């Protein structure tokens, strides 16, 4: 089995369908004795250019170890799913398990926000108490 990195973009109106899609696609891989090494749901992000008059899409990243047949099955599923705007499957040399730069940036942004959010909540609680 080989290692692959898969990124697919989902129509923003179908964002609530993404967890089911992820479950279905990871099921295809695991049913063929494959392994999902990394799964990241990046959420809605701005597109670099409009696709089908859309300016945002829901991004998902998968790093998997799978057979060529299961990857072909995934690509076919992507092709026939109208909600999937774009997909990319790349073969990699080894399993990638650490967080992607996108996930790291989001975590850093969240960690920077949370202390200030806590302070704002405390300040508003103090103001309400007075």
Swiss-Prot record:
Q: Which GO terms describe its biological process?
A: translation
Superkingdom of source: Bacteria
* Bias (Basic and acidic residues): 104-122
- Which Gene Ontology terms of cellular component type are present? cytosolic small ribosomal subunit
Task: Please provide the record's keywords in A-Z order.
Answer: Ribonucleoprotein, Ribosomal protein, RNA-binding, rRNA-binding
Q: Where is this region: Disordered?
A: 96-130
By sequence similarity, the record places it as follows:
Belongs to the bacterial ribosomal protein bS6 family.
Stated role: Binds together with bS18 to 16S ribosomal RNA.
Q: What is this protein's record name? A: Small ribosomal subunit protein bS6
**Species of origin:** Shewanella frigidimarina (strain NCIMB 400)
């Amino acid at each position: 089995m080989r290692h692959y990195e898969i990124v697919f973009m989902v129509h923003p109106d179908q964002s609530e369908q993404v967890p089911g899609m992820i479950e279905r696609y990871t099921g295809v891989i695991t049913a063929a004795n494959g392994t999902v090494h990394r799964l990241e749901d990046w959420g809605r992000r701005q597109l670099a250019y409009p696709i089908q008059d859309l300016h945002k899409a829901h991004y998902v990243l998968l790093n998997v170890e799978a057979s060529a047949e299961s990857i072909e099955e995934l690509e076919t599923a992507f092709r026939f799913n109208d909600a999937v705007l774009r997909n990319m499957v790349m073969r990699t040399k080894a399993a990638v398990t650490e967080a992607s730069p996108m996930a790291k940036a989001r975590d850093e942004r969240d960690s920077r926000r949370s202390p200030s959010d806590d302070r704002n909540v405390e300040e508003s609680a103090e103001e309400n108490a007075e």
